Structures are given as structure tokens and as C-alpha cells.
């Protein structure tokens, strides 16, 4: 058959599909913070409570249906709706907004190890929070995947 005959059309290479998992993989350095954190659910439009503070990560996210606060577990009232304790890992350095696949690179090994995560992104970097009981296992999974994990020196935000 010649190239022009039916059944012998050239096949197009996929252009929008990610076919090689290692092609865009980048090794990252993660800083592991020692402070135990909590994610607290407040009502929509809630003010940030005076008790909400942290020495590593403090984040407020508000939507029409809720306000979530990430803060030090030690300061959260027992009656508050919360998840934790969690340990935070921050991607070291400032990430360019054009960089793709950072969270994918970091979450893939944790998903394979069945480690649950809560992620937060700031203007500069990404944070991955894991249950305190899974923190060392998460660090080991990252190391096995080519990432580096170092102990962070907390600086109060």
C-alpha cells in the first residue's frame, strides 16, 4: 500500500497528552516545620479569631460557604470544628508562576503511599500538610522520589 491508500494514514503523535511521567519531573527541596497545625472551619464571613496564630504557617481562605483557617493546633479551642494535628512541608525557594507540575510531582508519591494531604499555596510557594503520624513516612516517600527534605527553622509569619 502507498501512503495515500486507506488504512495507511500516518498516525498523529499526541500533542496535549502527558505521556512520559519523568519528562516534567523536577526534584524539589521541602522544608519540614516542627509545629503541629490544624485546619479550622468557621462560618461564612467569619472574622479571624484572636486565638488563630502560628510560628510557621498561618492562612485564611474564605468562600461564600465557609472560612478556613490554618494555624497552630495549640491555640485552637477544643470545641472548634478542626482537622489535625498536621505537619507542614514548604517547597523551598520562590516558585515561578509559569512552573508546572510542582504539586503533581509532590503529591503523586504520597497518593501511592495512601497519605492524605491538605495543600496551601502562597504567592511564593506551595505547602503540603500531612497528618503528624504520617510526616516521617511522607518525608521518606519524597526522598525515594528524588526530592530532598530538610528541617526548617520557623520564623513567625
Predicted regions and their residues:
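Regulatory modules associated with amino-acid/nitrogen control
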Residues: 1-109, 113, 137-157
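A generic structural motif
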Residues: 66-71, 125-131
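A cross-kingdom feature marking solvent-exposed beta-strand/loop segments within repeated
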Residues: 112-128, 134, 155-157
